Amino acid sequence: MSKASKTAAADASITTGSARVKRGFADKLKGGVIMDVVTPEQAKIAEDAGASAVMALERVPADIRAQGGVSRMSDPDMIAGIIDAVEIPVMAKARIGHFVEAEVLEALGVDFIDESEVLSPADYKNHIDKFDFETPFVCGATNLGEALRRINEGAAMIRSKGEAGTGDVSNAVTHMRTIRAEINRLSNMAEDELYVAAKELAAPYELVVEVARNGKLPVTLFTAGGIATPADAAMMMHLGAEGVFVGSGIFKSGNPAQRAAAIVKATQNYQDPKVIADVSRGLGEAMVGINVDELPVSHRLAERGW
C-alpha cells in the first residue's frame, strides 16, 4: 500500500474498506491524470510529470491490441517493483469477473483495482463483487445504466470507457456525452417517472433517485480511452470528466516526459486555451493512432462488460 493510501485510511474516522472510505480516496484523485506504466522507470517519469496515480501493467493497450491473444493480470513482481518505485497511488488491472486476480492484487497492496475491459474477460455474466474487498475498484462504463450497475456492485470510481489503445478520442467523447445526457434527463424527471427510468437503465431505483436529486454520479467520474494530446484531455474535462486516464498516448509518443507533463497541465488548466496552446508546443510525434470506425466490432474493447 502506498503512503497516499495509508494517509487516506488514517484520516478516515470510519471503517477502512467501507464504501465511504473508498469513495473518499477516489475523490482525492479528482482533477488529476492517471498514467499507464510498464516499468518502474516509466512510473518515475509519470510521478515527476505530476501524475496523480499510475496504472501498472505489462503491456499498454496499444500493444495488447496489436499483439492479440489472451490478456491477463500483470506479473506480481512487476507490480511490486512499481509500488516500490513511487510515492503516488498505484493501480493495477484484473480481468472482468476474475475475483481471484483481484484478491492477488489486494494482497500485493495496490491502492486501486481496475476491473478492466482492456484485459480478456474471465466471466461473461458476472462482474466482481467489489464489496468483498477493502481495496477500492474503478470500472468502465459506456452509459449511465452500466455505470450504476458497477456502482451497485461496489465500484468507487467510474471511467467512461472510450476505445483504449487507439489514440482516437471519439468514443471517449461519445460515452462521456451519453452519461452526462442521461444524468441530465433524470434530473428533469418527476419522481414517479424514475421507476420507469430505472427499468430502462436496468439499474437500482435507489441509485437512480440519488443521481436525479444530485445531478451527478455518487462516485468520481474519470474518462479514458484514446486520449493522446493535451487538447484531448482538456476537452474531456469540459465535457464533465473529473480526471483523466492516459494509456498508450504517453509512452507511445515521441517525448513521453514532456507529453506527460503537458497533459497534466492541460487537465489542471482545461479552461485556459493559452496554457493548453503553450504546453502543446514542441511535443513531437503523438502515438500512431487507429480510427475507431475502422475497427471490427469484435475488436472493440469498450464493448466488453454489460
UniProtKB/Swiss-Prot annotation:
<dbReference type="InterPro" id="IPR001852">
    <property type="entry name" value="PdxS/SNZ"/>
</dbReference>
<protein>
    <recommendedName>
        <fullName>Pyridoxal 5'-phosphate synthase subunit PdxS</fullName>
        <ecNumber>4.3.3.6</ecNumber>
    </recommendedName>
</protein>
<keyword id="KW-0456">Lyase</keyword>
<keyword id="KW-0663">Pyridoxal phosphate</keyword>
<feature type="binding site">
    <location>
        <position position="226"/>
    </location>
    <ligand>
        <name>D-ribose 5-phosphate</name>
    </ligand>
</feature>
<dbReference type="GO" id="GO:0008615">
    <property type="term" value="P:pyridoxine biosynthetic process"/>
</dbReference>
<feature type="binding site">
    <location>
        <position position="36"/>
    </location>
    <ligand>
        <name>D-ribose 5-phosphate</name>
    </ligand>
</feature>
<dbReference type="GO" id="GO:0006520">
    <property type="term" value="P:amino acid metabolic process"/>
</dbReference>
<feature type="binding site">
    <location>
        <begin position="247"/>
        <end position="248"/>
    </location>
    <ligand>
        <name>D-ribose 5-phosphate</name>
    </ligand>
</feature>
<dbReference type="GO" id="GO:0036381">
    <property type="term" value="F:pyridoxal 5'-phosphate synthase (glutamine hydrolysing) activity"/>
</dbReference>
<dbReference type="Pfam" id="PF01680">
    <property type="entry name" value="SOR_SNZ"/>
</dbReference>
<dbReference type="InterPro" id="IPR011060">
    <property type="entry name" value="RibuloseP-bd_barrel"/>
</dbReference>
<comment type="pathway">
    <text>Cofactor biosynthesis; pyridoxal 5'-phosphate biosynthesis.</text>
</comment>
<comment type="function">
    <text>Catalyzes the formation of pyridoxal 5'-phosphate from ribose 5-phosphate (RBP), glyceraldehyde 3-phosphate (G3P) and ammonia. The ammonia is provided by the PdxT subunit. Can also use ribulose 5-phosphate and dihydroxyacetone phosphate as substrates, resulting from enzyme-catalyzed isomerization of RBP and G3P, respectively.</text>
</comment>
<feature type="active site" description="Schiff-base intermediate with D-ribose 5-phosphate">
    <location>
        <position position="93"/>
    </location>
</feature>
<keyword id="KW-0704">Schiff base</keyword>
<comment type="similarity">
    <text>Belongs to the PdxS/SNZ family.</text>
</comment>
<dbReference type="InterPro" id="IPR013785">
    <property type="entry name" value="Aldolase_TIM"/>
</dbReference>
<dbReference type="GO" id="GO:0042823">
    <property type="term" value="P:pyridoxal phosphate biosynthetic process"/>
</dbReference>
<feature type="binding site">
    <location>
        <position position="177"/>
    </location>
    <ligand>
        <name>D-glyceraldehyde 3-phosphate</name>
    </ligand>
</feature>
<dbReference type="InterPro" id="IPR033755">
    <property type="entry name" value="PdxS/SNZ_N"/>
</dbReference>
<feature type="binding site">
    <location>
        <position position="165"/>
    </location>
    <ligand>
        <name>D-ribose 5-phosphate</name>
    </ligand>
</feature>
<comment type="subunit">
    <text>In the presence of PdxT, forms a dodecamer of heterodimers.</text>
</comment>
